[in-house]
Curated annotation (Swiss-Prot):
Disulfide bonds join 95-363, 257-270, 294-331. GO terms for molecular function: serine-type carboxypeptidase activity. It comes from Arabidopsis thaliana (Mouse-ear cress). Keywords: Carboxypeptidase, Disulfide bond, Glycoprotein, Hydrolase, Protease, Secreted, Signal. Pfam families: Peptidase_S10. Its EC number is 3.4.16.-. This is Serine carboxypeptidase-like 35. The keyword Isomerase does not apply. GO terms for biological process: proteolysis. Gene3D superfamilies: 3.40.50.11320, 6.10.250.940, alpha/beta hydrolase. The active site is at residues 188, 399, 452. The lineage of its organism: Eukaryota, Viridiplantae, Streptophyta, Embryophyta, Tracheophyta. Residues 1-20 form the signal peptide. GO terms for cellular component: extracellular region. Probable carboxypeptidase.
Amino acid sequence: MKKNALWLLCILVLPAIACGRKPEKKVTISSSGRKEDDLVTGLPGQPPVNFKHYAGYVNLGPEQKQKALFYWFFEAQQNSSRRPLVLWLNGGPGCSSIAYGAAQELGPFLVHDNGGKLTYNHFSWNKEANMLFLEAPVGVGFSYTNNSMDLQKLGDEVTASDSLAFLINWFMKFPEFRSSEFYISGESYAGHYVPQLAEVIYDRNKKVTKDSSINLKGFMIGNAVINEATDMAGLVDYAWSHAIISDEVHTSIHGSCSFEEDTTNKTEQCYNNFKGFMDAYNDIDIYSIYTPVCLSSLLSSSPRKPKIVVSPRLLTFDDLWDKFPAGYDPCTESYAENYFNRKDVQVALHANVTNLPYPYSPCSGVIKRWSDAPSTMIPIIQKLLTGGLRIWIYSGDTDGRVPVTSTRYSIKKMGLKVESPWRSWFHKSQVAGWVETYAGGLNFVTVRGAGHQVPALAPAQSLTLFSHFISSVPLPSKRF
């Protein structure tokens, strides 16, 4: 089967499968309980900075000593004790928040030069908050288990429960942040991860003492997988409205594929008609439709094909090509992969202490199954809105994979009353996007000219968006 046909089969039919190498041996967890042992002091290529950062493992509990999740934590650049704590999650499922979020989007050190250099990110989100990046679930990045059966039980529910266990134990390492305002943010399939983790924290907080609770205030998700039916309809309509697919392809898909709830789209006619959709994206980047694709080598003009991570249901594969703002290079996914496979880097980050039997990969090659993935996050979002959490949903408007149309359709399905009508918002002298506020405080924000990974293509605008979110301040309505 040709690669594009496999991709199409995956998004329409198959359950979660991520092709890659299978672990050949068990590993033993070694995880310090002292944060001082996780302090990073000699990261290769790191520019000088005036803040501390930590990396290492956290065991998931006395009954789960075989499982440990890997983290990288950056203190805020100023007044860290008075700044909020923000957990960032990437999607997939199976993609690393460190290889993508930290190293290619919003962390303070961005990987360049084929993994040989780190550059300082002037728009890092740790300018505004203490930033915690987590590789979850086990099997992602450096996170691991010594029980191979754990890899057969992965899904949304396990990811949420393991992430909660991680946080509880992480706060034991970093008790000074236990009372900090806590937010969760992420993109793509983190449209599942983030609300689900927020819900288990919210529910747990009702059962424990204040001293044991997590001071959850809200979450922000970008280009997020939210609701299967509307996400899929928006995917097709976006391609048509942006002149990527023809009228004929658009009409044939709508005529043969159902975009109603609880449908599977497994018909042969739907599959065949979707081939035209796939063909249209063969030579452009679906995650950022107006930027160049990565070429496989300097000697070849053939586009470098993205790694395809097949995820549950229709909308959840996510290869997450990165897009850096200055000196744009669409090949930096491989740069991050090369960097984190370096032994000196792993030693500096206290990573891979058990010598995993497979190389580091930005998207996991060992997760073969994904057991559960609800078709919609809308009930959870509505529950947490009612519970008083601050929720912002943003969308880079040049992403074709989880496009702005999908997000608009999903929010419309929530049936919320508009409180502040659609308006432009500004970054300095330019329109940065548009914003609309709904009952309960839900903000929907677009980011003009940004693709799937908003912090990478619109770094200054994303930092403005982030700072206003955590401050609960309306986005600028005038030039400044």
